[in-house]
């Protein structure tokens, strides 16, 4: 038969059909490799520019070395297991059927045998190396560990053994066991494939070489298993599976001795395997292995179960007492609760005249602005341009104003690229022109204007106020919580400005331009760097645009928390970074924690669950990761400059052994806190997430007597936030207050406790009040002695002090309050409950809640209209806090609130919350009708003004509305006096459940 004619012309070479696939593979590998290189090299540039290249180099060298060690161990063990088994193969298989089957398998494998013998160890080595490299922190902590100077109560070993040595030994042992198991399986399969192990009718045949190989492998495995059993003895004090953490009675008297026996038994059986390899008889190691398995089941499982069920359970409280004591003391030490100051607080519920006189300074500082509701007011009054924004939750800090410390609600005006109009949405605008925000905006926490707006301390464009101006501090915000992914800044000297800086003025249409002059990011002027960053951010514009010049810098990774996490990978970063004006710069202050889950006898806590509250649920604060810890320290205070992004880490808890170990690893990355300026010291706060973890633990661990702890009769819970619909915990609150044992007020972080919530129900009465001193002083490098001091007020149950839920219910169900709030709701306005603050003043507990009104419309914002207060069973309700307190405390509280200057802006209530006797029901009804008509007219006029954007007219109508409401309240009180209805001030609140219409609405964001 003739061969088909070729389609290729004579003389032309035949094409190589197989060349395309390898070429594509090579090209793909080159592309992937260059992308990987681009990401690595840009990281190098980022760390070098920031001054933390040591961190990048140390971490990645550690990862590489550990990866190579893990890869080498797995590769060598697996390769030689396969190689030894292959070279030990018999020349002929005695059984013809088996020989035929093996020949068939071997024939299929032979063409790729060398590839498989090397490829499989390489593949498993890559997996093993990657797994090992992820444990780099354990390795470095072990190599650089520092002693705690404290020993555990069971083995009397330094705590550092459990936090830094035992995790490393556990990792190494577990890794080696995995290597031996994988290598052993590979050896067995190879022996079987080449006939050294054969399954026959008479049993399993094993060649002499295979016996020796398997015996040695088994001996090594058993020796490692014995080491693992021995280490398990120490791990028992880290046990968190029981009712209490640590080694309990059964662990100490059954599990630990059993682990010792099993460790010795495993070593003996390993010796039997070696003997079997020498003499060729397997009876003893087989019997030994069987006995080891039986012993591990009986002694490791059955025996401890018998002890627990028949010895411990009948007398659990007695037998576990000393171990509960260990759990209590070690948990309190691990979480920094061992130095808490506890005080019995015999709180009164009687609101007597002048009761607040001893707490005059605290009363004057009570915060009325809710940082979670006032953001829209900041936006409407201070945003100026659509491309600016404020965060949904503002921050609470303090500044010295006129010689006095003033609680302040503060935020920075950040850039919002999404606010650009459609015709502005170009790459050049988003990354070269609009690059930064501008200015700090701050308002007094305890005051507001007569029409309910914030009273600003710092505001405007240009930025002016008590915190400084453009000439005294740098107002530009290049690094913030909502900054763009990246921006290109900088230009040669003398070049025209390209960056949009700020509006020329509030009313003017002009804009000013600016050129970044700091050192904020890697240089991106060279062609090579342009290519790298174009690949990193997948943008050809970055490579081709004329907006990138020889002096250009690229700013990225701009979130303060992200920057701290990158330069300090060993820290867990607090969910709330906050800005402060410090030494002429805007600094983001970030708290960092060193944590561990290996502290002996300490209770485990899930960070995400312990720190969850209404703030994290609503997304206002970043939630912490879902990781377990049983040791935590606020070891680092970090600052991130909002202008150039520079990061400074201060060793705040310089006595923390974990931090000391990391300082040994990264010796140049942290500065001592003695280098912190006085201005920075004055803005340091006690961190929220640490406080939330501590209060969660205190719910149980305020009890230190083991018998009471065992019964759990005095356990507490953090109350739910009564201002939101969801059943989530109330967040802690920053405020300036004076605790009963303090000489003067201090900036503190506070929370309260109610009886333990069981099956979703609890008595909502106060059992405890916790405050953490957040005042670090204002001296350079000197930490105030009182900073971080936890103070716990324990309230006796018989005091019957209402909890936050009860206080909110009293507000909602009071008929006078309901009437006024229903009037405020007319005209489609929403009534918003502000944060419900709890303060230990007047010999009892005072509740304060601002009430905001928000009308409909895109340009509306909340204005503070009323203040609710409660003390015991009485409540007050007035346009100002000062007036409400006077209502509550018999006409005169004894102290002035911060908003006392606003008194009289609306008709005040009668002294003591009472009204003169009505002269006639007809007159009172007429007054009430007239007041309601005035209120309705003011609401309608306000809505019309708001629709026109006339905020001045809207403010005037709000004043008229407030005055009309007060007239209505007075008129209703006159009518009520004739029918014995409650008066509007200082009334005993009914406990009836309010109607839906009479209940103040929670914040819409919740």
Swiss-Prot record:
This is UPF0182 protein Arth_2749. The chain crosses the membrane at residues 18-38, 64-84, 115-135, 168-188, 211-231, 260-280, 287-307. Pfam families: UPF0182. The keyword DNA repair does not apply. It is found in: Cell membrane. The keyword Cell cycle does not apply. Residues 490-519, 896-923, 975-1006 are annotated as: Disordered. GO terms for cellular component: extracellular region; plasma membrane. It is a multi-pass membrane protein. Disulfide bonds: none annotated. Belongs to the UPF0182 family. InterPro entries: UPF0182 (IPR005372). Keywords: Cell membrane, Membrane, Transmembrane, Transmembrane helix. Residues 911-923, 979-1000 have a biased composition (Low complexity). Residues 495-509 have a biased composition (Basic and acidic residues). Signal peptide: none annotated. It comes from the Bacteria.
């Amino acid at each position: 038969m003739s061969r088909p004619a070729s389609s290729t012309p004579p003389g032309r070479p035949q094409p190589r059909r197989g060349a395309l696939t390898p070429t594509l593979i090579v090209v793909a590998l080159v592309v992937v490799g260059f992308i990987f290189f681009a990401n690595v090299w840009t990281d190098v540039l980022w760390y070098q520019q920031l001054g933390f290249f040591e961190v990048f180099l140390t971490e990645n060298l550690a990862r590489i070395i550990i990866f190579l060690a893990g890869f080498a161990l797995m590769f060598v063990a697996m390769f030689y297991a396969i190689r030894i088994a292959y070279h030990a193969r018999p020349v002929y298989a005695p059984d013809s059927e088996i020989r035929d089957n093996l020949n068939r398998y071997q024939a299929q494998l032979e063409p790729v045998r060398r590839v498989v013998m090397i490829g499989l160890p390489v593949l498993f080595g890559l997996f093993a190396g990657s797994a090992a490299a992820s444990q780099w922190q354990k390795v470095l902590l072990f190599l650089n560990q520092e002693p705690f100077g404290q020993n555990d109560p069971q083995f009397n070993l330094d705590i550092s053994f459990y936090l830094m040595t035992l995790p490393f030994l556990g990792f190494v042992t577990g890794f080696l066991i995995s290597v031996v198991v994988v290598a052993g399986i590979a050896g067995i399969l190879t022996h079987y494939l080449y006939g050294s192990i054969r399954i026959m009718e008479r049993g399993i045949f094993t060649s002499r070489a295979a016996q020796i190989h398997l015996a040695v492998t088994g001996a090594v495995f058993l020796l490692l298993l014995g080491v693992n059993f021995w280490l398990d003895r120490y791990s028992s004090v880290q046990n968190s599976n029981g009712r209490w953490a640590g080694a309990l009675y059964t662990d100490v008297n059954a599990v630990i001795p059993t682990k010792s026996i099993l460790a010795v038994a495993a070593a003996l059986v390993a010796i039997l395997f070696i003997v079997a390899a020498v003499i060729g008889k397997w009876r003893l190691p087989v019997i030994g292995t069987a006995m080891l398995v039986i012993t591990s089941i009986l002694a490791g499982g059955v025996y401890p179960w018998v002890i627990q069920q028949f010895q411990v359970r009948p007398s659990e409280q007695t037998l576990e007492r000393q171990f509960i004591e260990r759990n209590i003391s070690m948990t309190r030490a691990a979480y920094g609760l061992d130095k808490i100051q506890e005080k019995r607080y015999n709180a009164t519920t009687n609101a007597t005249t002048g009761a607040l006189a001893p707490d005059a300074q605290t009363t004057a500082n009570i915060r009325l602005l809710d940082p979670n509701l006032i953001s829209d007011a900041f936006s409407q009054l201070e945003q100026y341009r659509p491309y600016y924004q404020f965060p949904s939750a503002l921050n609470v800090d303090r500044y010295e104003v006129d010689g006095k410390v003033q609680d302040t609600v503060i935020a920075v005006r950040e850039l919002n690229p999404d606010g650009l109009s459609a015709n502005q949405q170009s790459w050049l605008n988003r990354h070269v022109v609009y690059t930064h925000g501008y200015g700090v905006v701050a308002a007094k926490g305890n005051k507001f204007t007569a029409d309910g707006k914030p009273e600003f301390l710092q505001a405007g464009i240009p930025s002016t106020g008590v915190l400084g101006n453009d000439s005294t501090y740098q107002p530009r915000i290049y690094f913030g919580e909502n900054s763009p992914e990246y921006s290109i800044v900088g230009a040669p000297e003398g070049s025209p400005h390209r960056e949009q800086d700020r509006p020329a003025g509030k009313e003017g249409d002009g804009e000013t331009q600016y050129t970044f002059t700091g050192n904020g990011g890697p240089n991106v002027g060279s062609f090579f760097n342009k290519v790298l960053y174009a690949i990193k951010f997948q943008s050809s514009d970055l490579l081709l645009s004329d907006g990138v010049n020889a002096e250009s810098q690229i700013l990225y990774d701009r979130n303060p928390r992200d920057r701290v996490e990158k330069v300090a990978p060993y820290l867990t970063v607090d969910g709330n970074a906050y800005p402060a004006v410090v030494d002429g710069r805007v600094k983001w202050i970030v708290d960092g924690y060193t944590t561990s889950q290996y502290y002996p006898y300490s209770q485990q806590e899930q960070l995400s669950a312990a720190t969850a509250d209404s703030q994290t649920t609503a997304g206002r604060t970043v939630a912490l990761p879902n990781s377990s810890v049983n040791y935590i320290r606020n070891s680092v205070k970090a600052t991130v400059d909002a202008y150039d992004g520079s990061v400074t880490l201060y060793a705040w808890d310089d006595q923390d052994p974990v931090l000391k170990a990391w300082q040994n690893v990264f010796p140049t990355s942290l500065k001592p806190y003695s280098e912190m300026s006085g201005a920075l010291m004055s803005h340091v706060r006690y961190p929220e997430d640490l406080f939330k973890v501590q209060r969660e633990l205190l719910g149980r661990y305020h009890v230190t007597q083991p018998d009471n702890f065992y019964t759990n009769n005095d356990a507490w819970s953090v109350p739910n936030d009564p201002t939101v619909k969801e059943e989530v915990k109330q967040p802690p609150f920053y405020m300036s207050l004076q605790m009963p044992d303090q000489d003067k007020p201090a900036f503190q972080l506070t929370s309260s406790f109610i009886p333990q919530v069981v099956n979703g129900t609890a008595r909502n009465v106060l059992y405890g009040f916790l405050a953490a001193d957040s005042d670090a002083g204002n001296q350079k490098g000197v930490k105030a002695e009182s900073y971080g001091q936890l103070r716990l007020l324990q309230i006796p149950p018989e005091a019957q002090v209402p909890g936050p839920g009860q206080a909110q219910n009293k507000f909602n169900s009071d008929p006078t309050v309901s009437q006024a709030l229903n009037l405020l709701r007319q005209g489609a306005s929403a009534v918003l409950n502000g944060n419900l603050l709890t303060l230990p003043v007047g010999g009892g507990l005072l509740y304060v809640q601002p009430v905001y009104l928000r009308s409909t419309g895109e340009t509306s914002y909340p204005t503070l209209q009323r203040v609710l207060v409660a003390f015991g069973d009485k409540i007050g309700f007035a346009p100002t806090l000062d007036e409400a307190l006077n209502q509550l405390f018999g006409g005169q509280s004894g102290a002035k609130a911060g908003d006392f200057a606003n008194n009289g802006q609306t008709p005040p209530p009668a002294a003591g919350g009472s009204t003169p006797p009505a002269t006639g029901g007809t007159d009172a009804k007429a007054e009430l009708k007239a007041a309601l008509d005035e209120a309705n007219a003011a609401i309608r006029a306000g809505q019309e003004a708001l629709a026109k954007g006339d905020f001045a007219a809207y403010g005037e109508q709000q004043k008229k509305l407030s005055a009309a409401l007060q007239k209505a309240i007075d008129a209703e009180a006159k009518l009520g006096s004739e029918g014995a209805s409650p008066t509007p001030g200082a009334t005993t609140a009914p406990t009836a459940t309010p109607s839906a219409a009479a209940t103040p609405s929670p914040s819409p964001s919740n």
